[in-house]
């Protein structure tokens, strides 16, 4: 299996690079800069493409030039948020215009251009699959006030629905992962029990997201998961 992961240098993206593959697979990481000392299971081949999603047209072209002519899975782990998001200091009316434009550019425009260039290569696979990293902020009545971030993640739901319809005949599986607050401080090398203890139930370990994605990748071509909602156990919004 050949898997491309966009937004792969740190946090969840890096955990996916290090955790979803098994012997014989190829993982292609994409980020602005290639990280050091990526730890992979034995028998997994690593490739890397350096591209800055803040310049979406240039990034999409660069990725398309370097990507394989065919691969099986595209995981779009693309997303930035407001500087004061998820803090008491957030105020939509105080957000700089250019910051909102930059957020939309990375979270929506870059994702669309990337999909436009890479979906044809996915369709060469006998089991093509797209996984979009969304957020519980994209759910109705999520209880979050971050307007631009929430709107950008809500847009991914529309992208996923439209992709499914447009390529239903090609059996393209498209999944949105609606993730709650993540513990991205503890890498996969940290025992999951220790990672789960951080935040006292308020943070989802990346280990759990990796476990779910592994399951998605191992489904037969007769089924797919349309949407998966994964909040932290102590999240009072759910």
Where do the protein language model's features map onto the residues?
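N-terminal Rossmann NAD(P)H-binding glycine-rich loop of SDR-like oxidoreductase domains
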Residues: 9, 17
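Rossmann-fold cofactor-recognition segment
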Residues: 42-57
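Active-site loop of short-chain dehydrogenase/reductase
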Residues: 70-72, 122-135, 169-173
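Substrate-binding pocket helix/loop in short-chain dehydrogenase/reductase
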Residues: 85-101
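Catalytic loop of short-chain dehydrogenase/reductase
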Residues: 97, 129-155, 160-161, 165-168
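A short, exposed helix-loop element centered on a Lys and neighboring polar residues
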Residues: 115-116, 161
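C-terminal helical subdomain
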Residues: 176-177, 193-238
């Amino acid at each position: 299996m050949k898997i491309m992961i966009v937004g792969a240098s740190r946090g969840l993206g890096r955990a996916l690079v290090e955790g979803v593959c098994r012997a014989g697979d190829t993982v292609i990481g994409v980020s602005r800069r290639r990280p050091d000392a990526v730890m992979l299971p034995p028998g997994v081949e690593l490739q890397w493409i350096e591209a800055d999603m803040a310049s979406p047209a240039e990034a999409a072209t660069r990725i398309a030039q370097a990507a394989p002519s065919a691969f099986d899975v595209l995981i779009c782990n693309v997303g930035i948020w407001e500087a004061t998001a998820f803090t008491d200091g957030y105020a939509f009316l105080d957000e700089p215009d250019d910051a909102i434009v930059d957020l939309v550019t990375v979270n929506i425009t870059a994702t669309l251009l990337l999909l436009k260039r890479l979906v044809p290569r996915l369709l060469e696979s006998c089991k093509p699959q797209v996984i979009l990293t969304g957020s519980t902020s994209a759910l109705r009545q999520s209880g979050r006030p971050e307007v631009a971030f929430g709107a950008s993640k809500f847009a991914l739901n529309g992208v996923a629905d439209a992709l499914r319809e447009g390529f239903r005949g090609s059996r393209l599986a498209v999944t949105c992962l609606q993730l709650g607050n993540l513990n991205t401080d503890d890498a996969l090398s940290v025992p999951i029990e220790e990672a789960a203890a951080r935040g006292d139930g308020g943070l989802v370990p990346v280990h759990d997201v990796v476990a779910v994605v592994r399951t998605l990748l191992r489904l037969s071509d007769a089924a797919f998961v349309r949407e998966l909602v994964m909040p932290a156990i102590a999240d009072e919004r759910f």
